[in-house]
C-alpha cells in the first residue's frame, strides 16, 4: 500500500519521563487507486491506543479530503503535559484545518475543532 504520509514522533507528551509514540498515517493524494482514502493520527502509550483523528472516505472523494499532519507539540498550560496541534492540508488552495487536542483524564480530547471556526 502506498502511503503519502507515515510519521512516528517519539515524545514525552504527559511528563512521566517515558516517550509515547505519536503516529500519523495517510494515503490521501496517493498515486495508486485504493478503494478507500484515510487519515489516522493516534498515540500509543503502554500498548494502549488513543485515536485523535480518523477520516475514511472512498477513493472518488480524495480531492475533497485533506492530508493530516502534526503541526506542533506545545505545553500551553504550563502543567507539564503537551497539547497536540494538528493540521490538515487540502490539495487545492482551501484554508487549512487546524485542531487542538489536550490531555484530560489520561486521554487526549479535541478542544479546538475545524467545525468551531
Residue ranges and their predicted role:
Residues 1-117:
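Beta-propeller-forming repeat regions
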